[in-house]
């Protein structure tokens, strides 16, 4: 009932409002006043009868009750306004028609949609008005812009322009800045509310900061620090019980259990037989080796250029389905069966050996001191390359010579040049006090270049003699830096006997007027060819020289006491590069380009030939014990030979990047070094044991740098101090360095 009454009331209200609207129209017509243009009024009047007809049909009782007097009373002529009707005026109508309630389905129009207040959708889109307001007046449709205005409006866009017209109001829809920002955030899948922070700052309620203030300010009780008396009593009780035997330890309990089991154990007579049967059943079969997997070395359809000329394989097939079966399959299977049947297989356990354990454990360099580590002094004075060095037996004097033909004597401790002289290739000697121009003058007057190839101090400290090789001449000189007693003792080495005819020409210093100012030239020896190396015998009476360019007199041995020279070989086997005496035996070591031969001078026979395995030997040095030899080569290798072990190298050391020029052993310490064209001097520790079963210990110690490389030539000569772990090196830069 309530639904029907509400529906009646709504129809009454709508009818009442429509009647009021019609009367207002009649009054406006009677007065001749119009609120709209003629065209609009004419068009609207054409639609009024249909609207009026609908109202009359809906409310038939309303038109019947109105009388002519009431029409005259409320006409437009009387000037009165139309009274407003309330819904109560239509409640008593008997002829009111009731309609069934309309149920709007899913496919029907959305009549319940929310619209703007006071407006509803008009079904008359072609009318000039679009709706009625709350007073029942017409709401005129806004004027539609022309095409030109629309174009201008699309160019001059307002702020927030969208290009959408609201169908309710007919006006363009403009968006605010907040709405544009909201749409932008939604399009970028962001949070719509810009004030919302999805990642707020983390507030660590439980920090790692230790609070200094305690929860309770009460002081710590004494029982926290004093040992517990109750625990002490309990420990005493347990200790007393253990001593009395009332409490057993775990070891005592285990021992008692073993004793009880041994006392009551039953002996099984057949235990060993069963174990033997079990062991017999478990045979250790070695699995057969697996077949190799198929390979892809050959193609069934290779290109033409890969086909062999022979009739063997590979053969070419057009497709894989025409490839025949393998012809040797049965043969290979049969051979495999024979191998599995006849060939024994052994199971070998794999040895897991750490590779580090196979390497020898070398001591650290700090444990092998002393050895040279830094440059403490530089001797500067030579012009050009310094080719040879030699230290006196006392260790106080250093002799050097080079391409400038000047012999210089240096004081080791101070680095001062105490004496120097220029030697030419004609057997003349010129003294040079302190003028360097005299050196250049003497070199310019000589018709042949004077290059000091080698020099060596004699092994006798009481009779100091320096042997200097300049081209084909050997000078025996005593510099004026020694005492008179030492000088007289050195003279006696050359005046004990007259000179004899030999392979070389001997001349006394006094006859040839080779007496230098302050120094003495005892004798000169002229050989047929240029001399490359010198080597003194340990007794100081013999000197060996080598000449690579000579064949019959490549090696000469000069005896100072007799004043004679002899050639131990009628013809040399190759170009002799270096020669040296054995330190303990009457042996002579001769190094050619690829071999080192050891000769017994007493028996005049070949003792051993060392197979170096290098292309060109450059230098040679013998250990003080005489059982070990090292050589340097131009192919960047240093070879260590153990004469008691083998004729092949015991160790091949290849640490330099260029050719080796010189190698040398220390006279008394377990050290040896090598100088190379890369400008480096490498120092090694080489300890030799008296036990023949122990191998020598070789440890790299230090790389000494700072030598200049001139025209691809670096270090040319090295020599050790006879007592200290000091090393002297000379190179192509014209400087001599002392390493300590």
Curated annotation (Swiss-Prot):
InterPro entries according to UniProt: BOP1/Erb1, BOP1_N_dom, WD40/YVTN_repeat-like_dom_sf, WD40_repeat_CS, WD40_repeat_dom_sf, WD40_rpt
Gene Ontology, cellular component aspect: nucleolus; nucleoplasm; nucleus; PeBoW complex; preribosome; preribosome, large subunit precursor
GO molecular function: ribonucleoprotein complex binding
SMART domains: BOP1NT (SM01035), WD40 (SM00320)
Residues bearing the modification Phosphoserine: 434
Biased composition (Basic and acidic residues): 21-31, 44-55, 252-270
Source organism (scientific name): Schizosaccharomyces pombe (strain 972 / ATCC 24843)
Protein name per its UniProtKB record: Ribosome biogenesis protein erb1
Biased composition (Basic residues): 1-14
